[in-house]
Amino acid sequence: MKRINLKRIAAAVIAVSSVFAGVYGSTVPSAAEPDEYHDDWLHVNENAEIVDMYGNPVWLTGCNWFGYNVGSQVFDGVWSRNMHEMLTEIADHGFNLLRVPMSTQLLLQWKNNEPDPATPKINEWTNPELTVEGVVGGKVKYSFDVWNQAVKWCRELGIKIMIDIHSAETASAGHQVSLWYTDKYSTEDWYEALEWLTDYYKDDDTLIAIDLKNEPHGKADVPSQMAKWDDSKDPNNWKYAAECAAEKVLAINPNLLIMVEGIEVYPKEGYDWTAPAKDWTTNTEFYYGAWWGGNFRGAKENPIDLGEHQSQLVYSPHDYGPLVYEQSWFHEGFTQESIMEEYWYDNWFYLLEEKTAPLLMGEWGGFIDEQHDPDGSNTKWLTCLRDLMIENRIHHTFWCFNENSGDTGGLVYDNFGTWDEDKYALVKPALWQDENGKFISLDHKFAIGANGISLSDYYSGEQPTLPSESIDTLIKGDVNNDK
């Protein structure tokens, strides 16, 4: 596969576009020549905007669909409905990015071509395409083959994919484990899984991002299980682990966006990571708390450093409402302004305001029906956050498509067969659309679903090109020099 190495022509690129100007200087990641699989890689410019290869700003507005992380070996819901039909509905509703939770365990299973521990939860009668014979009622395919079929369909539907390492071990409660390693799967196993995944899809820009680890968390009650953020090389230092993982991933594919989530707690002024969780005799709190994965206070003094690949960094907090947990900022009469002052700003919004890096809200969602939310407080929070993301073009993936998320519900119900139109109506204004209400894809070739347009359509197909006198000097070849 031919590539253009922009490191050799940084000056020419800067003359054409300001995409990688300023802080990135000559450390521009290699960009591929425009073609079906290499024209959609995304990068970050000096204004903390995510941009395409031409410097055009994009807005990642997607949703989550889980199943692979919990042991289903496939998206949940394929046990009843046709996978392609559901992916088509997601595209038609305008979600241009699919965040897919997986596990280190599953990726290593696929890497080693190990058999599925159980038959994937696929209805072979409604999914003949996912059977070995390709017929109704046939034998269900190997889970990795099914996954690659999903990738192909996403590509054709204009949906981009972000893989989320939701847990080390495949389990319905795997996200409850605070760190990226367990007794069964080490940090090295996590690295191995990430490297294999990156290498396998390095020539397919359907997969544009990796969320290195879902919701690192933990408190000082159990220090060894507490994800922390400092300048140490301690095994539970999330900052160090994330930088090491990102370095390995970007050495293989320097075009992937790297999503780094936050942690749960951070020491208050005058204290450090050796402080206890709380002094119960005086009721003194020694740490600032946050949602799991939502605390980026440590990034102010110790920001993530990806070296020459800094233009691939995106910080990815999670945020939920009072129906998940009655946090202190959900007091009576809360507003968008009060949440900003009491929680959002110091934990993650400052990163966007200071243009440190873009933000992608990796999870946000919840019930809005009268039965679950009788006083409307959860709906109020959702509206506050949605409006903030629209106003500031914060990227996001809504939690979730699934109906079987116990504390949030999903975009569908009735065994994945019916869309929750009220919830979708709340989310829809935060999906990337043009002035005519057409959904916008992150793909230059494929429109998003039946109701959208491609990225090239949105920008009228008028893309800047490199100066002709510089093209002759380009050195083309595989970006990793491994072919």
Question: Where do the language-model regions lie?
Answer:
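Extracellular glycoside hydrolase catalytic/binding regions
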Residues: 79, 181, 191-208, 213-392
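C-terminal segment of classical bacterial N-terminal signal peptides
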Residues: 19-29
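Aromatic-rich peripheral "rim/lid" segments of glycoside hydrolase catalytic domains that contact
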Residues: 371-471
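Aromatic-lined substrate-binding rim segments of carbohydrate-active enzymes
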Residues: 75-172, 200, 237-254, 374-397
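N-terminal carbohydrate-binding accessory modules
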Residues: 28-99, 110-130, 137, 463-471
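Sec-dependent N-terminal signal peptides
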Residues: 7-19
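Acidic, divalent-cation-chelating loop motifs in proteins
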Residues: 474-482
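Structural recognition of the beta-strand scaffold that forms the well-ordered cores
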Residues: 50, 58-65, 96-102, 106, ...
